[in-house]
Amino acid sequence: MDDDGARSKTIHHDGGVIVTHDERKISAEEVCVLLPTLDEEATIGDVIDGFRDHGYTNVLVVDGDSSDRTREIAREHGARVLIQSGEGKGQAIREALEYVDVPYVLMADGDGTYDPADADQMLEPLGRGYEHVIGNRFANMDDDAMRRLNGFGNRLINRAFRFIHGANYADILSGYRAFTVDSFDRLSLDSDGFTIETELAVECVRQGVDTTVVPVSYAARPDESETNLHPIKDGGNIILALYSLAKTNNPLFYFGSVGVAALLSGIGVAAYVLIRSVYFGVNHEILAVVAAAGILLGVQLLMFGVLSDMIVTLHREQRRRLERVTREFNRKK
């Protein structure tokens, strides 16, 4: 890849380890603007024009078989259009990446809520060696851009993500992303729907993708544009995804949380059986068996969680060593 600007060394701290990066200017020709859409005829033209006005002419619209004129308008405004073969935003993104022939992707929604003027600052960290950038909508959000229920749900999900997966990405549900194609190829993504942003964040943690957050503007949807998001249903799916994805990223939490619940339930039932037997002379043999099973299951799940966490930690350490050796080898070439 040719350099389009001067290189210089920058240093940042990552988890107490000093990491050095080559700094370079990323040219617009190296970037594909990816816009997943579904029935966005009211806004897609202005979104495409906004990115093109800022020099990003390589725009790929991946459309979920819209019933309106989204595709026609996108073509009229100079974008390439891909009709996804499956359903859901996650599947659309995975399929679209197969048609990207440049090293960097800038992803946004086609509803006009994200500002194309933020494109340069989204891409700037990639020039410093980061592999994935998340745009933080809460840094500069219009007052009417998010309903109160949606805002509460977003903050709850971000806190749950920090607690379960141990990283603070500020706004994991943001659809404004910039990333390298190489880092995307390392991620194991299965989500088809709106849980794709959650899965991206979890996979960045699990795979050790160098990720940072930048502030972006977030505006309200135009009145003529309708959202495809269902807050209760999709919010529930996202919470379940956070827990499910902990299986391979934080197995101690995944198995331990169920183990603690089973253990406490078993102890509670055992206490009830003991009190009834001592003070009332009533024996509950079946409940005693249930209590013993709950305690045994809880202990086993906790032990399994600890062992799984040790394996995951060892795997991460081996991966870091391999990546360090690879970097040193490439540096000497």
Label for each model-derived stretch:
Residues 170, 210-218:
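Catalytic beta-strand/loop signature of glycosyltransferases that borders the donor
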Residues 63-71:
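A conserved acidic beta->alpha catalytic loop
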Residues 251-333:
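Membrane-embedded multi-pass helical conduit in multi-pass membrane proteins
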Residues 1-50:
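N-proximal low-complexity "stem/linker" segments adjacent to membrane-targeting elements
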Residues 84-99, 104, 116-194, 198, ...:
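Acceptor/aglycone-binding surface of glycosyltransferases and processive sugar-polymer synthases
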Residues 40-43, 66, 89:
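Donor nucleotide-sugar binding loop of glycosyltransferases
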Residues 112-113:
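Acidic metal-phosphate-binding loop of nucleotide-sugar-dependent transferases
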